[in-house]
Amino acid sequence: MNPEHSPLGKATVYASQYDASLLFPIPRAGAREQIGITSALPFFGTDIWNAYELSWLNARGKPQVAVATFYVPAESPNIVESKSFKLYLGSFAQSKFDSVDAVRDVLKRDVSAACGASVSVQLVSPHDFGKLEMDELDGLSLDRLDLDADVYEPDPSLLSAAEDEAPVEETLVSDLLKSNCPVTGQPDWGSVQIHYVGPQIDHAGLLRYIISFRNHTGFHEQCVERIFLDILHRCKPVKLAVYARYTRRGGLDINPFRTNYNQPMPDNARTARQ
């Protein structure tokens, strides 16, 4: 489905009852073709969605609330457009469910169907809200660099690495990632973590490259995949992982993770800006 046909940027009618048809899938293939991915994926990973505005009624009509986390595999053929996800979750508000498990099962079934792959779902109930963590992405901050920047569309030529020197292992972070919704033009603010093993990447060039997304239009997942591929092609690391955490909109935050080597799932602790 085309993003222009999604609920984004259109007048909204909020459903009063649960409605799975509100979910609007968008194929990943189109955006991947634009960055040269036409066959096997050069990465694997997950999109971590956190939903903070989920509520439903129990069997006796009493409202219940939870924080939901969805783990969408990067190999799924579709993503779900975020406003449609918000409207879908909102449709639970006046619908009765017998248990938390019943809600989880419905969420897993519907979102998996929309994405075209098995999606894991976790629900955190209010008595466990205090266990939810807040933390910043770990790594050496690129934002410490005092530099000039004047490129605000993605430019891979800003990236370079010392290929004639000994390889290094580094984790680098920046809070200066900003892109824009391809439908509404609204800004998407994010933090990004880049872990790699290979020729040392020029830090100033990498920061300028991250800044260059400032006027770019693309969904969160697409931006992270572009960053991953550009670093992979320009800097030639042996191992590479890119993880971004975007600020919340409509009660949802989206946190794409891409890697080309086996490692544990990244921490889902929300950052201060989320």
Swiss-Prot record:
HAMAP family, sorted: QueF_type2 (MF_00817)
GO biological process entries: queuosine biosynthetic process; tRNA modification
Protein's UniProt name: NADPH-dependent 7-cyano-7-deazaguanine reductase
Keywords: Cytoplasm, NADP, Oxidoreductase, Queuosine biosynthesis
Catalytic site: 181, 188
Matches recorded under InterPro entries: GTP-CH-I_C/QueF (IPR043133), NADPH_dep_7-cyano-7-deazaG_red (IPR050084), QueF (IPR029500), QueF_N (IPR029139), QueF_type2 (IPR016428)
EC top class, as a word: oxidoreductase
